[in-house]
Regions:
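Nucleotide-activated chemistry modules centered on ATP-dependent adenylation/adenylyltransferase
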Residues: 1-24, 29-207
Length: 207
């Protein structure tokens, strides 16, 4: 069975890939609108942990709409959720060239955790994706809380941690920040996105 996992190069999506690896042929998917080097950063992380990666182009109009929504809201939650929803549907519906063969995925997955506020996937949304696209939706970390994830990261991954705007990652936030700065100015980015740290995976620990 072949699973496509939405991948940012961070600790959560990397742990999700490792958990799925015993049961699926896992391909990581960098979902991008192409306005930054996010896909390249995701590819570097994928290579560091030994998984293949493909890219999928998202509808840039969705990203622009998400940016406008975040500016109007004054916080990023709903905009990031909107892009994640679009990414899952795009991966579920798409065909991808993996190792020279064009394939669809039997399952799609992400690195959402039990305690996440955003992005999240409700039971109804998961069932809707499964019914409409004929795939399984998997959330390997959905039963893991923050401390459990931190313990697994400490035991398994080599990561870099730093302020979100300084870490080279392949996630939606980096591209949404860039679009927002272009359309609304750096002041809007500072107002919408709270200061927080993120991680970038650079390798696996020896076990």
């Amino acid at each position: 069975m072949h699973a496509g996992l939405c991948y940012s190069g961070g600790k959560d999506s990397t742990l999700a890939a490792l958990l799925l690896d015993s049961f699926y042929d896992v391909t990581l998917v960098a979902a991008t609108v192409g306005v930054t080097d996010a896909a390249d950063h995701a590819r570097e992380a994928a290579e560091a942990v030994g998984f293949p990666l493909v890219t999928v182009e998202l509808d840039e109009a969705v990203a622009h709409e998400a940016v406008d929504r975040m500016v109007a809201d004054g916080y990023p939650r709903n905009g990031i959720q909107q892009v994640h929803d679009h990414a899952l549907e795009t991966v579920a519906a798409g065909e991808f060239e993996v190792a020279g063969t064009v394939e669809t995925f039997d399952a799609i997955a992400d690195g959402t955790r039990r305690d996440d506020r955003v992005p999240t996937v409700s039971r109804a949304q998961a069932q809707s994706i499964e019914d409409r696209y004929g795939v399984d939706y998997l959330a390997p970390l959905s039963g893991f809380g923050r401390s459990a994830v931190d313990d697994l990261v400490e035991a398994t991954l080599v990561v870099e941690t730093g302020p979100s705007e300084e870490i080279d990652k392949g996630d939606y936030e980096a591209e949404l920040r860039a679009l927002m700065a272009e359309e609304h100015g750096e002041e809007a980015v500072d107002e919408v996105f709270p200061d927080h740290d993120q991680t970038r995976v650079v390798g696996l620990r020896d076990r």
